[in-house]
């Protein structure tokens, strides 16, 4: 493990590869620049280059009024073309184009994460996922069939969206009707019985009206994982009125249904760094790894969810420079699941004989039955104007939002132990039955914000923004009395066993002030340097709508605790080269997170904890030539505890689930009019694992490289095929690991996906 910890070889290779890429681009840029100058000297008219399909020039969120190249933040925009070329069908797969971002954490103890459980720069970002700038609640997997582009903003986003994760946010932009008619359809088959079909129909009606319909159906097994299946269907109709006029109305609806088999992972026995949890179980030190195909759940396990979202947006151009928008959205995400996972540790192992093939491990049933709802109305005004010689690019607005969550209490499910090496899933514990011990959370928010970019001179810009949030959170929860184990309560006199008893009933109100400020200087027409500073806050209950009583306990949701606060400073540079077809960026960053909960010497808890994430990131997106496209990046990040208890398994101050080095690159080349080839590579460095007193579990996950490839063939203007190969060299790796380290999710083996794309 020591080599993986210090990365002497892997670090060199990834840095050398990316440095070589950048060095290789330089002479090309110089040559094209010289050619452009020669054309200018000959007074020829040179047409502007076609924007790259791999590098959208503008965020679709009106809060970001400047082009991506002039935004003083680290921002990656993953276009629809990238998603199509890679065959990425969900958000987690699309985010593989962003270095250091991924689903690295597999949950705590017996609990396992579901859906898009994203970590970014040392923090859980799964509750900072937005659709069209509006928070999307729920631990579900988000399909990309109705997605125009994915925008990843690193650093605090509190000024942009209110309470959020301290290190970044993710915004999925929905497809909208457009003023041209066409039909796009796809049919895919692949490894592990993968079957998927999509339909995208856009039809113009009259001069200013258009309708659009996106449909998706998918059914597949998880490659390399027995018994794990996924099935989802979606439909997204929309209509637009007033296209091309000063008044536009958009109506959208989204419905997605999923029927999946959750995966609790497999034991870490045999992984580097594993040792038996006790002397009596020492045979596990030499018994080898379990088969990665093993399924430790039951045939009754399920993860069902339904998403319904209705949106109305009205836009009015007051004049050529000023637009007002009003968006109303109602959304509901319902999810219920029964997920079985193993319980590691010596006390959970049963040894009928000395043969490890007869040993069993305890299983636990994780359950969830939850309904999330959001109702919001947002008004935004954008305007460009001058005050004297100073130009202004303003975005301002107000937001009213109500978010509610109900966690329905369910009766516990008891499961038999499972054989460590030969698990049997033919167990039928039945479904979930509600017991009335529910938890209800509601947060009402009123927010007002204002951003302005000031053009001081032709080359120098200042920008700033402030957001004020007034929030009120109410929370109550009940427990079925008379149970056993952690959190059990006795029944009050006269109350029957199993009856719900309210244990928490509290509320919290407050105000949040988030702000950001930056400056940008254009060194040339194509390149700039910038600095930025931003402050973001997350109040108690802001992450999960749950509150805890004041005065005792280590929950960050205690009503007497202050909001978590993040301060980020960034200095960077962005360059548009090769006739502005290719965007190169580099940035140094530091995020300090304050008000973390820590234990005092007397056993009480205070908010003196501090964390820090710092490092640098470089990225590339766009076209090297009209036929050669790429997107990628590299980051080095150091995430540590600055004040408080160390949480890594090895006792160091490092934050877990954060690769110190990460690299990603995807490149595609149009070899002929009909043939295209693509290839990509990703590197995720070794990561520390969290600690909860587990004995013998790996302290690190090993770093790994994964390569992908694509071959495309165009039959005619109406039909083309593409073959995607994932994990080309069939690399074995740990995709995610849980906090105790007793179980992990293996990475997907080599798989194939063949897609027929039709255009009319």
From Swiss-Prot:
Cross-referenced InterPro entries, in alphabetical order? Plug_dom (IPR012910), Plug_dom_sf (IPR037066), TonB-dep_rcpt-like (IPR039426), TonB-dep_rcpt_b-brl (IPR000531), TonB_box_CS (IPR010916), TonB_rcpt_b-brl_sf (IPR036942), TonB_sidphr_rcpt (IPR010105)
Q: How does it sit in the membrane?
A: Multi-pass membrane protein
Summarize the protein's role.
Involved in the active transport across the outer membrane of iron complexed with catecholate siderophores such as dihydroxybenzoylserine and dihydroxybenzoate. It derives its energy for transport by interacting with the trans-periplasmic membrane protein TonB. Can also transport catechol-substituted cephalosporins. Receptor for microcins M, H47 and E492.
GO molecular function list: siderophore uptake transmembrane transporter activity; signaling receptor activity
Subcellular localization:
Cell outer membrane
**Motif TonB C-terminal box in this chain:** 743-760
Q: Source species, please?
A: Escherichia coli (strain UTI89 / UPEC)
* Predominant location: membrane
Question: Family, per the entry?
Answer: Belongs to the TonB-dependent receptor family.
Source organism superkingdom: Bacteria
The record's section on Pfam families has: Plug, TonB_dep_Rec_b-barrel
Signal sequence bounds: 1-31
Q: Give every TBDR beta-barrel domain span.
A: 180-760
The record, for NCBIfam families, names: PRK09840.1, TonB-siderophor
* This protein's UniProt keywords: Cell outer membrane, Ion transport, Iron, Iron transport, Membrane, Receptor, Signal, TonB box, Transmembrane, Transmembrane beta strand, Transport
Q: Which GO terms describe its cellular component?
A: cell outer membrane
Q: What is this protein called?
A: Catecholate siderophore receptor Fiu
Q: Where is the TBDR plug domain?
A: 67-175
